């Protein structure tokens, strides 16, 4: 039984929604960031870059987060941001050139996270957990929701469809040609239906935002200890999430790029691969895998198809069937000597949306010796691994939609 809760969002006035909201901070190059800050006085980026006009400031994290909080208050005082008077759910739709995503922004329960109603598929880094917890504690808000996915639900789908027939509270297109629409759901009957519908859903799966959710849970635990009148209903007991039906989630694979062959020549490397794979040389013809346990490889000017020898490989449990794990156990670890795939300096990852051409260009540049591609992980595989209480290898999935920051802000 999943707990979802309406909340009073802080958000931009309708005429400034496109100007205030931004892409996630890490998607901006330094040049793009500089341009946004210089020419858009309303962008949320000013809040999270409080010392933009004085780059010489050397601040501790705590002081920087305090300045973020102050800039946030300034945006509210100037009426750039306002807090809704009624608690609501928010239906958000993002339309790209290839996909349309539509789900519900809600407060979700820390208790559900602890009780495994909200399940994760990736591990987190303690250092990042603590950093973001401190950010949340010192700023008092969260501007980027965790992406959760749930099994398709007819009741929720019907409510979303009903609101899509109405005028959106926000409707704008960004320079990347994506369209964004937002509807406010503050009618009591609709709120009750959404709450009841999610009570029938046993599990919500984290698709993106593992550190945000974990940090929110850490913060809730610490604030509860500091509050002698803690009831469990305080806003810090929830975190903002974007709930998206499984059928609308898009999962892409990450390509792997390796800087050296661990002392092997290309021919010796191919010989080592032959233990676990049947190998086809495709020359300059781009090869993309068509089935699970098939891999593409670019080495020494040629594309190769690698087909796993299933009679040799040991399928032990759910995780061992995952292509990213197969590549690690048969190639990256035993042949290329990469033990720690999260932190090893000789491996680089890139999400694959280029039809395989990137496998060639990055190796031909001389920066890498070999590259690998595979089919994307499916939502079915992701759920099987999570339900078996396992974690996926790092950089196994690149999941869309990527959500805008400060379209909706959650205060606690």
Regions found by a protein language model. Name each.
Residues 1-412:
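Surface-exposed, charge/polar-rich loops and edge strands
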